[in-house]
From Swiss-Prot:
Family: Belongs to the mgp1/MG371 family.
PANTHER family: BIFUNCTIONAL OLIGORIBONUCLEASE AND PAP PHOSPHATASE NRNA (PTHR47618:SF1)
One of the record's GO molecular function terms: nucleic acid binding
InterPro entries: DDH_dom (IPR001667), DHH_sf (IPR038763), DHHA1_dom (IPR003156), Oligoribo/pAp-PDE_c-di-AMP_PDE (IPR051319)
Designated name of the protein: Uncharacterized protein MG371
Signal peptide: none
Amino acid sequence: MISIDPQFIKNFSKKVKQFDKFSLFVHVNPDFDAFGSAFAFKTFLNTFFSEKKAYVMGSYNINADGRELFPFEQTDINDDFVKESLAIIFDTSNQERVLTQKHKLAKETVRIDHHPRTEKFADMEWIDSSFSATAEMIGYLILQMGYKLNDEIASYLYAGIITDTQRFWGPTTTPQTFALTAKLMETGFNRNKVHDAVYLKPLLEHKYFSYVLSKAKITKNGLAYALIKKGAYKHFGVVSPLPMVHALNNIKGVKIWTTVYFNESIKKWIGSIRSRNIPINNFAQMFNGGGHKYAAAFVLDEKNQFMKLVQIMDDFLAKQNENS
């Protein structure tokens, strides 16, 4: 069994027993790891502390993947509840990315995250980038607090793990990831239901995937990139723009791949970078971003900044190729 700082477990367990109200927070544009971690912890509270109340903030009336799996909130949560609650923030590396920003109203805050630490913004934090997913952290936390995993908790954690590890393909997958996954499977949860919720997409989204792939360019140094035009997603019936960086996965000869799209709500260009084994988070940090060693995101004010980033990464690959 993996070891977690015993002082954190002791202090966190005290907080769980002390508070009767919990507001659970995820990052903007929440993915399966964020929602999986939050809903798994909500289910843990409902199972072992049925008298307590917990809500996943921002999941009410949201357009996001996972509606077939996660029981999104049916009502909005008022500020008075948050003010009396322990806020737990999942899978969020910096404060400005917390969905709703209402964690600032909470009586106390806890943050649990597997991204590299960039800032401290909660009263209590457990940050460990050796984990493949925040969902993996939550699974081990529940176990080391002395509780069991049930099939509902397991299904949510599994969704978070398989997406953040890219079905265990990614370099962040470790023996401890497989060890926890084995424990999840022992609960007998319905894997087919999770797989369908995560991977089945409408035909139009598949066409959008093909569109992004058709726009990709590949340099002789092994960089693939695609700039997605403003509003392109609307032609495919997609509800909101997506980074679609996975459209460039698994292309032979490609070492780094990146995409960028225009986010109409914040009026900025949002991009993602991926690689198999080359650290790329430093490139994202140059352009108002960051993330994991092999998976990162960035934010641009102007579209032409994307080509500057592309040039920087391509020059890096050119030098690397010369030295190999």
